[in-house]
Design a protein with these regions (language model features):
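Non-catalytic structural scaffold of enzyme domains
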Residues: 1-172
Length: 176
């Protein structure tokens, strides 16, 4: 966005959002977004999967339709990218419990013919990443627990549905 000022807000007081109930995440995220819109921002970008899942419909209704402020989130772009690259239509999602329970990714992929989503909540990944534990036996044990069922189900494309995952676990692959 050349020529635009970018304001980054990270809710460090309440992060990580992943372990929080989805209704609490919705309240927290909408409160921050209300302040931003009231201050005159031209666009909202929600870079957290859990926050995106929690506020997706409310944010579009409240800000895009209600006030003309576009809302960009991470769920639909990730779902579209996964649908484009899958070879067998079996897409896996690893995410926080709130993101999985919200069905936001399932809803985003619902209209894509021939695609099946298999979702797994990975709560320990966020906690480990927050503690700086990104390699070692704890991570590998959790990775096997979370990823092996997806591999066994024939998943060929994996959505990393939490921003902690691609930053903290760059070396992980589906187990063979």
């Amino acid at each position: 966005l050349p020529g635009e000022q970018v304001l980054y807000i990270g809710d460090t007081e309440h992060s990580p959002y992943g372990p929080r109930p989805i209704d609490e995440v919705r309240e927290l995220a909408l409160a921050v977004m209300d302040e931003l819109v009231d201050s005159g921002v031209k666009m909202l970008v929600i870079a957290c999967n859990t926050a995106s899942a929690a506020v997706l419909h409310d944010a579009r209704r409240r800000y895009t339709l209600g006030k003309g402020v576009p809302v960009v989130e991470v769920i639909h772009p990730a779902a579209r990218a996964a649908a484009r690259v899958t070879r067998n239509g079996r897409i896996g999602l690893i995410a926080t419990q709130g993101t999985v329970d919200s069905r936001a990714y399932a809803d985003a992929l619902e209209a894509v013919p021939g695609v099946e989503l298999l979702s797994t909540a990975c709560p320990d990944f966020v906690e480990l990443a927050e503690r700086g534990v990104t390699t070692g036996p704890q991570v590998m044990s959790r990775a096997e627990e979370y990823l092996l069922p997806l591999r066994e189900a024939g998943v060929d494309t994996l959505i990393l549905g939490c921003t902690h995952y691609p930053v903290s676990y760059t070396h992980l692959t589906l187990p063979t």
